[in-house]
């Protein structure tokens, strides 16, 4: 008997406080296909809390549009500006909360791991990552976004696709109960 090919939708997010990128992959068997990529433009919001609300609303809207099975999100890198890191962490947390509210499992990937998975070079530029994705997913140069944040979101999804079927060291959560069970020290 022929088994039907399993389809999986992966949403990838590149968190940001000015521009947040996302990409959506459909995986049929072992073949990935880009079905969307774009940005959430937060530049018009002066208040950080309004940005967080907009991130939550837009991520939920993207989830409702594409019905992803899993979320791959880029983990914040460690920078020198503590305030910027705090705001970026909040933005990432709000995007994760939106996915968790729909019981979507989440996996975080370090920027270096994503770049390494896509280009073979952990120090690759955003342009090199975008160019490699364009070649691997066969989308037209004209479809290349103005903001590389969109291809960074797509890169997170593609990195997750490459990790499917392999043991993953990063923490993944299937919902709030799973998060609490794996992180009791973080809950008061």
Swiss-Prot record:
Q: Which reaction does it catalyse?
A: Endonucleolytic cleavage at a junction such as a reciprocal single-stranded crossover between two homologous DNA duplexes (Holliday junction)
Q: Catalytic center at which residues?
A: 14, 74, 149
PROSITE patterns to which the protein is assigned, alphabetical: RUVC
Q: Where does the chain bind Mg(2+) 1?
A: 14, 149
The compartments listed are: Cytoplasm
* Cofactor-binding details, from the entry: Binds 2 Mg(2+) ion per subunit.
Q: What is its main location?
A: cytoplasm
Return the Pfam families for the record. RuvC (PF02075)
Q: What is its EC number?
A: 3.1.21.10
Instruction: Give the keywords, sorted.
Output: Cytoplasm, DNA damage, DNA recombination, DNA repair, DNA-binding, Endonuclease, Hydrolase, Magnesium, Metal-binding, Nuclease
Tell me the superkingdom of the source: Bacteria
Q: What does this protein do?
A: The RuvA-RuvB-RuvC complex processes Holliday junction (HJ) DNA during genetic recombination and DNA repair. Endonuclease that resolves HJ intermediates. Cleaves cruciform DNA by making single-stranded nicks across the HJ at symmetrical positions within the homologous arms, yielding a 5'-phosphate and a 3'-hydroxyl group; requires a central core of homology in the junction. The consensus cleavage sequence is 5'-(A/T)TT(C/G)-3'. Cleavage occurs on the 3'-side of the TT dinucleotide at the point of strand exchange.
Please give the subunit comment from the record.
Homodimer which binds Holliday junction (HJ) DNA. The HJ becomes 2-fold symmetrical on binding to RuvC with unstacked arms; it has a different conformation from HJ DNA in complex with RuvA. In the full resolvosome a probable DNA-RuvA(4)-RuvB(12)-RuvC(2) complex forms which resolves the HJ.
Matching entries from HAMAP family are given as: RuvC
Q: What is this protein called?
A: Crossover junction endodeoxyribonuclease RuvC
